[in-house]
Amino acid sequence: GTSGVWPDLQASIDSLKKILSDGKGKESDPTVASSLMGWMFARCDEEVTIGNEWICKDPYVQRDHAEDPLDAFTKPTTNQAFLYFCQMIDYITGPEWAAKVPTHIKIYNIAGDQDPVGQYGRGVYEVTNWLIDTGHDVKTTLYSGYRHEIHNYPDLKTEVVWNLAEFYNNVLGCGFESMMEKYSS
C-alpha cells in the first residue's frame, strides 16, 4: 500500500471495535464511511454527487466505478469489513512493516499526487522512505495533477502502462525492449 499514515486510524479502529462489540458487525453504518473516508473529497473541485469523485476527475470513470457489481456502491460495506480494512492499513504502516517485506523484491510505487489514499503524494513518499530505510530497492513515480485511478485517465493510461512495462523489463529482463522501441517511435 502507498497510503502512508492514515488520518485518525486508531480512533476509527477503536470506534469500529465498539460497534462490533455491540453486535453490529454485519450492518453498514454510513457514518463509519464518512468518518473514515469523508476527508478524501477535500480536493475535489467538482460537485460530489456519486460519492467516489476522489478516485478520478473523469465522470465516465466515476460512473463505471460506481456501477461495477463488485464495488461497494452496489453492496454497502459492512462495519466488520471497514474494521478489517483499518486493521490492514495499520499493519502496512511504518518502518516495522517495511522491515518485514523481503528485500529481494523490487518495488515500484506509483500514484497520482492528488490521490487522497496516498495522502496527496506525502504518503507515497513515506512508504518509499520506510522501504528504502529498511534496505529495499524502490522506484517511485507521482503523476502530477492526477487522483487515485491513474491507469484510467485517457491522457495518462498509456504512459502508466509503458512505465510499468519498463519497470518489469528492468526487473525481470522480459525482452520488452524491442516492443517498446517498435511502439514508442
Which sequence ranges carry the predicted segments?
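Alpha/beta-hydrolase-fold catalytic nucleophile elbow
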Residues: 1-3, 110, 144
